[in-house]
């Protein structure tokens, strides 16, 4: 009987640990907690104000496809619902205006992310073609302090 109680207590503890781990992973994915880890810092200087929202959307997509786990742009935490609007010289992310120099902080496997950004005809190449100076720096510890404000889903519902 004592062994059964110990076993039940161990199972309850394992379930609680799994639930805490799942919650932490969900918070990181949603961008609602500060994080740190290996990754890259991408510095973009657009002195001519030639970059459009298209370049930012493309960069965000490349980062996600390369396995980025957390992304910040000019102090704004990006999430799955982030959006870019505006014209060259007047870009906004999630409704907040941003300006050059642009600093992307990205957590993930640094070499994979750096390679993805620097592929031929990729986002870094397109920004350079528009006159921007782009520097991609792999880093052993990127810190992202900003958090995204959670927004309720507009269309998705739980079944």
Predicted regions and their residues:
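Juxtamembrane "stalk/linker" segments
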Residues: 1-40
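Extracytoplasmic/luminal low-complexity segments enriched in Pro/Gly and acidic/polar residues
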Residues: 123-159
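Charged, low-complexity, helix/coiled-coil-prone segments
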Residues: 1-10, 58-62, 135-149
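Non-transmembrane, low-complexity coil segments enriched in Pro/Ser/Thr that form solvent-exposed tails
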Residues: 28-120, 125-126, 150-157
